[in-house]
């Protein structure tokens, strides 16, 4: 085809051996492959894979049940004296027993403020929060992805419950708004407004919540996006490039801190499967940096935040299918999420 002058279409190769093979065929240096990928082919693949067919939805429903068992088992075993590694090992065991494996390396951490903390060295301590971001992958390769945050010892403190309720409200708001014709970027911003409003009521933020979100101030507490597509990859098709998977000509990626980390921003369509995963994190180094540099000081009550430096973080993540009229949860059973449900699951 190359000798005939025909255009050769390929997508960004993922595996190392494929990169070497393709570079050899095309006579290119490996680091030049990215310069000649076919945007037409990428867009065609995205358009087919992003709309989940009934057979795919059935696979996602199946693996979601394994994810449910993983999280409820973690809740039942979460107690002082165990290690984060003990919980992670049980998640691995249940995923394997379900016929597959975990869909990514599980996050099991009492330092929820570290967004992708893959260390399992901590020993569980009463009064602390344990953030568990974990999912399963089934034999067909389809993935689940849920996050729950648990109070070690089985009961939320009043301070923890205040923050938890804000995150839960943001999760609910995101699910209320997600439907065909709505950009997920707008859903993200509304979830952020709920977070800013709740933190303002607690005195941790000040001013108008909508203005704080527009300015990017609320991203101090949630420096990531509301969600991403799911399917055969837990971050579905991410290797093809988020600007094609999560964005399009009508919706471009923001450069603003926090909002720019949103992986899925474009208009939702029936058949999309996306995560809804708001969070609130108290990251001492980031808070101190913003305070030192007077970043958004009109919106943030820095002195009051010092009493939250040992808080950690809370994230609550569900997987939803966009339907013709709105959305629904993927999976027959939702991992416990209301505070009373979580506490009950931890005392069985």
Model regions: which residues?
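Active-site neighborhoods and metal-handling regions in enzymes and metal-associated proteins
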Residues: 1-348
């Amino acid at each position: 085809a190359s000798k005939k002058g025909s255009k050769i279409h390929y997508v960004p190769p993922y595996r190392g051996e494929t990169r070497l093979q393709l570079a050899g065929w095309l006579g290119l240096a490996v680091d030049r492959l990215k310069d000649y990928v076919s945007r037409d082919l990428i867009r065609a693949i995205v358009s087919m894979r992003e709309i989940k067919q009934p057979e795919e939805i059935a696979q996602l429903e199946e693996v979601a049940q394994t994810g449910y068992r993983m999280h409820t088992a973690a809740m039942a075993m979460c107690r002082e004296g165990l290690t984060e590694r003990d919980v992670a090992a049980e998640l691995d065991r249940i995923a394997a027993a379900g016929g597959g494996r975990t869909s990514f390396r599980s996050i099991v951490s009492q330092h929820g403020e570290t967004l992708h903390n893959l260390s399992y060295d901590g020993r569980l301590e009463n009064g602390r929060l344990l953030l568990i971001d974990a999912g399963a992958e089934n034999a067909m390769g389809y993935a689940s992805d849920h996050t729950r945050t648990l109070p070690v010892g089985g009961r939320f403190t009043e301070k923890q419950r205040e923050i938890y309720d804000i995150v839960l409200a943001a999760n609910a708001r995101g699910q209320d708004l997600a439907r065909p014709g709505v950009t997920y970027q707008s859903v993200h911003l509304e979830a952020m407004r709920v977070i800013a409003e709740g933190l303002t009521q607690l005195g941790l933020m000040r001013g108008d919540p909508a203005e704080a979100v527009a300015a990017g101030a609320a991203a101090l507490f949630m420096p990531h996006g509301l969600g991403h597509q799911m399917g055969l990859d837990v971050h579905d098709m991410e290797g093809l490039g988020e600007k094609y998977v999560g964005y399009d000509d009508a919706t471009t990626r923001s450069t603003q801190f926090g909002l720019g980390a949103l992986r899925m921003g474009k208009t939702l369509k029936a058949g999309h499967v996306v995560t809804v995963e708001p969070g609130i994190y108290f990251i001492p180094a980031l808070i101190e940096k913003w305070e030192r540099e007077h970043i958004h000081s009109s919106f943030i009550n820095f002195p009051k935040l010092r009493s939250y430096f040992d808080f950690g973080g809370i994230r609550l993540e569900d997987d939803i299918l966009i339907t013709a009229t709105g959305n629904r949860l993927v999976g027959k059973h939702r991992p416990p999420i209301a505070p009373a449900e979580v506490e009950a699951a931890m005392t069985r």
